[in-house]
Amino acid sequence: MYKEPFQPTYEYALECDKHDELKDFQTEFYKKEGTIYLDGNSLGLLSKRAEKSLLTLLDSWKEYGIDGWTEGEHPWFFLSEKLGELTAPLIGALPEETIVTGSTTTNIHQVIATFYEPKGIRTKILADELTFPSDIYALQSQIRLKGLDPDEHLVRVKSRDGRTLSEDDIIQAMTDDIALILLPSVLYRSGQILDMKRLTAEAHERGIHIGFDLCHSIGSIPHHFKEWDVDFAIWCNYKYLNAGPGGVAGLYVNKKHFNRLPGLSGWFSSRKDKQFDMEHTLTAADHAGAYQIGTPHVLSTAPLIGSLEIFKEAGIERLREKSLHITRFMLNLIAHELSDFGFTIGNPLEDEKRGGHIYLEHAEAARICKALKANGVIPDFRAPNGVRLAPVALYNTYEEVWQSVMILKKIMKDEEYKQFENKREVVA
């Protein structure tokens, strides 16, 4: 599919673009002329199909009013379940195990409220010190709601190098006092992929439920939840899945747990045929839909309809193949062109351990990101010293990768970054 061996040349980049089996999808996305967008790991670009599905649902409100809940091409009442079914193949789950609902953080609250049952000596939640802050805030909150002290009952696995986690260290921390585990599938800074299959097996061997935050993996790498037997997972849909800013998130619950009453319930937790009976006793849905709480955010869900159509056509395996190849090309270019400018590659180099973005460390990272933006390259900065660059398989080209590295080289060689302040913007 892609030309081998790797060559750090412009001609090689053009040759790879020529043989890219996914190149036709690039025209599906709105790409600003004169800009190289490498921030799809933070917010994916708008596709024409996502725009169309948003306008379609807006029109259904215009045409049907209240009857839009049951009429039209995409009846709102069943939309969360329908999109869950379309998402399920991306994580290797059954359709009934997946639901589009809430936000990442509210869904963390939901699964922790459901699965965290401190009893006897098992009172602690295991996480890690490199995970996204919102995960930690939610875990601390849920521990407090049980009347416990997060300082004592939230265990965070330490990183050996400040970038990655050792799976051996995580397993060693699965002690007899651990009641529940929540880990990232891919670390948001370094892009390290954790071995979810191994960690799940080790947790279950010790009688511990385990779940994963998929925000930086879904839509970028394949998952095999049916095989791995993961207990639960949560994710956002606005990064690699291109559902738009504030797009409604996703939640997975293994079918073996369908007999559990959701920790947080609302009327959309109901079985559909019972919901409008308005009874004060909840008859929970017998699928992941039970983990919904309130009325779905229809217009914030709508873009995902068109986006998931694209993923179905492209295929997650093909997307991963290109992602690995184009990130390897970028890594090789960085090693070849930027070795004299003080950069450290902070993500794993092994394909099986590397997610969809490149993570560069530099003492001047914040001002380098500003200089890149001034030159038409959109990265993002992560404190304290990280530059993230995500060549997304659906819409980025090898030519763009080559151009972005050359622009970065010029910025460093000419010290253009020095005209900017070395601190982050309000939104990094």
From Swiss-Prot:
Q: Which GO terms describe its cellular component?
A: cytoplasm
What catalytic activity is recorded? L-kynurenine + H2O = anthranilate + L-alanine + H(+); 3-hydroxy-L-kynurenine + H2O = 3-hydroxyanthranilate + L-alanine + H(+)
The kind of enzyme this is, by top-level EC class, is hydrolase
Q: What is this protein called?
A: Kynureninase
Q: Which cofactor does it need?
A: pyridoxal 5'-phosphate
Task: State how it assembles.
Answer: Homodimer.
Q: State where pyridoxal 5'-phosphate binds.
A: 104-105, 132-135, 213, 216, 238, 267, 295
